[in-house]
From Swiss-Prot:
GO terms for cellular component: nucleolus; U12-type spliceosomal complex; U2AF complex. Component of the U11/U12 snRNPs that are part of the U12-type spliceosome. Interacts (via RS domain) with SRSF1 and SRSF2. Interacts with U2AF2/U2AF65. GO terms for biological process: mRNA splicing, via spliceosome; spliceosomal complex assembly. The modification Phosphoserine is found at S353, S389. InterPro entries: Nucleotide-bd_a/b_plait_sf (IPR012677), RBD_domain_sf (IPR035979), RRM_dom (IPR000504), RRM_dom_euk (IPR003954), U2AF_small (IPR009145), Znf_CCCH (IPR000571). Pre-mRNA-binding protein required for splicing of both U2- and U12-type introns. Selectively interacts with the 3'-splice site of U2- and U12-type pre-mRNAs and promotes different steps in U2 and U12 intron splicing. Recruited to U12 pre-mRNAs in an ATP-dependent manner and is required for assembly of the prespliceosome, a precursor to other spliceosomal complexes. For U2-type introns, it is selectively and specifically required for the second step of splicing. The keyword Iron does not apply. It comes from Mus musculus. This is U2 small nuclear ribonucleoprotein auxiliary factor 35 kDa subunit-related protein 2. It comes from the Eukaryota.
């Protein structure tokens, strides 16, 4: 096209081309015609070749189309299967969701019905309780009106009897052994056993009357072991002595006191309890009327009659020999030692009582031996000026056990010597009917054994 344009320009133009340009243009035209001829020839050859190969190409094309159609059909069938499976899964899922929805609605309906039924029952119970309360109030008001009418008419008033079912329930329960022995139970009103509160007793109990800083701080030992450094056992015992000389004359002013004990237990239900036993119940009742509600050391005293009359069962025997395995958790009485061992015979139930006969005075020698043992044991305690406590026993238990074992060996050796002396001189004893020098010592080893190893007592709560 450019050549034609150039030729047209050349012929149309007013000026002629130079020979050189003219020859170049002609050469270009010849090359163009030659290329066109070659292209026409090539196209003719291709057409002829295609005509020769046309049956094979058609068959190949048809085969390819057939394979493509089969592949398309196979893919379509697979898609249909997948679609059908997906539809089935969808329908199953919808069915499960519908069933779950129905179950949820049914459950909600049941819960709502149960809640409404429960609310209805609660309303009925509340209404019944209110009705019963109104009936009781009406009965009480009727009883009060009747009592007022009787009082106005000159009648007498008395409290009504308790229900019979409560009495039957109390009879079926077993007695609490610790309340019967010590007058206190660590469970208190929650105890499953029966506490027989006496209406009259020769023993008066004042709970928590004796309090010191050391006894109050014992509750902090579990999480503050250094609290024991702020007080000493000597100070606690000195405070007990001051308390003893302060309160005992007041108790003696009411009647004859035959036992006075102050508990040094660390358990809350026994800590600082004061036990005062009078010779008669009348004196104890008089003391109750005098001291109950009275104030001492900034606290109001609450007195009660105590069932304890046998101190041998109440006092922990192992504590006296510094071998109590329960320590501060013992539920038997750990008591302070009274000055001059006062009322020491009452610790073993040896105080004289009205039912004693003249035959009981034949045991004077036994009591003298026991008293001498108490003097020997408590004399060492007075020199130490220390009140018995679990911590003190824990530090000095080993040395005291060694000394007590040596003491028992010495006593047994003396007993053997006296026995040999007794066997060597039978004629002299027959001649002289008075007891020989060995006879008081004959009872000494059993007394020593009974003092060093007291009667077995349960040391834990049932």
């Amino acid at each position: 096209m450019e050549t034609a344009g150039a030729t047209a320009d050349a012929t149309a133009g007013p000026q002629k081309l130079s020979r050189k340009k003219y020859l170049a243009l002609r050469k270009k035209e010849r090359r163009k015609r030659r290329r066109q001829a070659l292209a026409r020839l090539r196209e003719a050859e291709l057409a002829q070749k295609e005509e020769e190969e046309d049956p094979l190409a058609e068959e190949k094309r048809l085969e390819e189309e057939r394979l493509l159609e089969e592949e398309r059909q196979r893919l379509h069938e697979e898609w249909l299967l997948r679609e059908e499976k997906a539809q089935e899964e969808f329908r199953a899922k919808k069915k499960k969701e519908e069933e779950a929805r129905k179950r949820k609605e049914e459950l909600e309906r049941k819960l709502k019905a149960e809640w409404e039924e429960q609310q209805r029952k609660e309303r009925e119970e509340e209404e019944q309780k209110r009705q019963e309360k109104r009936e009781r109030e009406e009965a009480v008001q009727k009883m009060l009106d009747q009592a007022e009418n009787e009082l106005e008419n000159g009648g007498t008033w008395q409290n009504p009897e308790p229900p019979m079912d409560i009495r039957v329930l109390e009879k079926d329960r077993a007695n609490c052994p610790f309340y019967s022995k010590t007058g206190a139970c660590r469970f208190g009103d929650r105890c499953s056993r029966k506490h027989n509160f006496p209406t009259s007793s020769p023993t008066l109990l004042i709970k928590g009357m004796f309090t010191t800083f050391g006894m109050e701080q014992c509750r902090r030992d579990d999480y503050d072991p250094d609290s024991s450094l702020e007080f000493s056992e000597e100070e606690i015992y000195q405070q007990f002595l001051d308390f003893y000389y302060d309160v005992l004359p007041e108790f003696k002013s009411v009647g004859k006191v035959i036992q006075f004990k102050v508990s040094c237990n660390l358990e809350p239900h026994l800590r600082g309890n004061v036990y005062v036993q009078y010779q008669s119940e009348e004196d104890c009742q008089a003391a109750f009327s005098v001291f109950n509600g009275r104030w001492y050391a900034g606290r109001q005293l609450q007195c009660e009659f105590c069932p304890v009359t046998r101190w041998k069962m109440a006092i922990c025997g192992l504590f006296e020999v510094q071998q109590c395995p329960r320590g501060k958790h013992c539920n038997f009485l750990h008591v302070f030692r009274n000055p001059n061992n006062e009322y020491r015979d009452a610790n073993r139930d040896l105080y004289p009582s009205p039912d004693w006969t003249s035959s009981s005075f034949g045991k004077n020698s036994e009591r003298r031996e026991r008293a001498s043992h108490y003097d020997e044991y408590y004399g060492r305690s007075r020199r130490r000026r220390r009140s018995p406590s679990p911590d003190f026993y824990k530090r000095n238990g080993e040395s005291d056990r060694k000394s007590s074992s040596r003491h028992r060996v010495k006593k047994s050796h003396r007993y053997g010597m006296k026995s040999r002396e007794r066997r060597s001189s039978p004629s002299r004893r027959r001649k002289d009917h008075s007891p020989g020098p060995w006879e008081p010592e004959q009872e000494e080893p059993p007394q020593q054994e009974s003092q060093s190893q007291p009667q077995p007592q349960p040391q834990s709560d049932p």
